[in-house]
Amino acid sequence: KVEMSPLVHTRMLYVRDHVRQNVEQILYFSRLGAAHKDCYFEPILILETCREAVEDNLSLLEEAQFSVTYSGNDCNVISNKKGFMFILGQIISNSVKYAVKDTAPAIQFSVTDNPESGQITLSVSDNGTGIPASDLPFVFDKGFTGDAGSFLSRSTGMGLYLVQKMAKDLAIDLQITSQLSCGTTIILMFPKV
């Protein structure tokens, strides 16, 4: 680091994190068909874990000049932290990948706790390119890139597919809403325990 310029060091961290995410995707994909899945469930704080995921992806977010905000009260849920971190990493990666150039890219993590229903949700919203309404029903399908695939060569159609598979393993319900040119929100609904 001493012999590198700050710009080269920042770019090197960006490439390192990008490679790490690709390797994680490959490893999670290879585990999909496993008969026995090694999942340790424990109490985790949602926003604290979101902050850890942001820290793990900080070079990607800084390179794209993202602002990150958090709202709501931190809530305990029972989940597998490693799997939840993977989900968050993929969502962050997509937000960076589909950020609109020449804007102030932003991502927000918002926790809602409904005491009446016992439902705890995490909404992760960005102000990126958004997803066409015609593509929304297919974004969790394996290999689906939609319109994004035609203009972004890095699109593999695997990120949200793996997010959906991991969420299913963790009993987290997923919803996605998006408006073209306005951004995307992914909502994670944690099981009641």
Cite the ranges covered by each PLM segment.
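Conserved micro-motifs of the catalytic ATP-binding
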Residues: 34-39, 76-80
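Short conserved segment of the HATPase_c
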Residues: 131-143
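Short conserved segments within the C-terminal catalytic ATPase subdomain
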Residues: 60-70
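Acidic ATP/Mg2+-coordinating residue in the GHKL
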Residues: 126
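Short helix-loop "hinge" at the ATP-lid/N-box region of the Bergerat-fold HATPase_c
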Residues: 95-99
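Short alpha-helical segment of the dimerization/phosphotransfer core of two-component systems
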Residues: 14-19
